[in-house]
Amino acid sequence: MDTKTQSLPITHTQPHSNSRPQGHTCSQCTCSSHCQTCSQSCSQSRSSSQSPTGHHSSSGHQSQSPHPTLPPRHQKHTRHSHHCPPRPTTHSCSYPKNRKNFEGKVNKRKVVKRSQQVYKTKRRNSGRK
């Protein structure tokens, strides 16, 4: 039992010291690769927009292959921007709902008054009998 507890911290310290530098290099690698991919896609979109200047429609169609990579990215952005509008839409939705509820309440009150009147007349009729 004692040897196990002693060996555990030792094995724990080793991966920790190993994972720390690895994690740093990993994060740096991902960052640089991400930046490279970003810059590459940016340069590609720039070059593609420059090369098909409307002179060759056929080459424009071919150069559209890098373009489809851009629209999905735009779609993601659009989705994010779409996520924001629904909130105001819900507000505008709740506004008419409140209106309807208000009208409904007024109508219900009228209906209740009518039913009460009918109830009174019925009572009177039953009282007459």
UniProtKB/Swiss-Prot annotation:
Any Pfam family: TP2
Q: Which residues form a coiled coil?
A: none
Query: What segments bear the compositional bias annotation Low complexity?
Result: 22-67
Modified residues annotated as Phosphoserine in this record:
S126
Domain of life of the organism in this record? Eukaryota
Q: PROSITE patterns this protein is in?
A: TP2_1, TP2_2
Q: Name one GO biological process term.
A: positive regulation of protein processing
Q: Which residues bind Zn(2+)?
A: H12, H16, H24, C29, C31, C35, C38
Q: Where in the cell is it found?
A: Nucleus; Nucleus, Nucleolus; Chromosome
User: Ranges of Polar residues compositional bias?
Assistant: 1-21
Q: Name one GO molecular function term.
A: zinc ion binding
Tissue expression remark: Testis.
User: Nuclear localization signal: where is this motif?
Assistant: 104-112
Assigned GO CC terms: nucleolus; nucleosome
First-listed, main subcellular location of the protein, grouped into a coarse class: nucleus
Residue ranges, compositional bias (Basic residues): 73-85, 120-129
The set of disulfide-linked cysteines is: none
List, alphabetically, the InterPro entries matched.
TP2
Q: Where is this region: Disordered?
A: 1-129
Going by the UniProt record, its keywords in alphabetical order are:
Chromosome, Developmental protein, Differentiation, DNA-binding, Metal-binding, Nucleosome core, Nucleus, Phosphoprotein, Spermatogenesis, Zinc
The protein's matches in PANTHER family, at most eight in alphabetical order, are given as: NUCLEAR TRANSITION PROTEIN 2
- Which family, according to the similarity comment? Belongs to the nuclear transition protein 2 family.
Q: What does this protein do?
A: Plays a key role in the replacement of histones to protamine in the elongating spermatids of mammals. In condensing spermatids, loaded onto the nucleosomes, where it promotes the recruitment and processing of protamines, which are responsible for histone eviction.
Report the protein name in the record.
Answer: Nuclear transition protein 2
Lineage, uppermost ranks? Eukaryota, Metazoa, Chordata, Craniata, Vertebrata
- Gene name of the encoded protein: TNP2
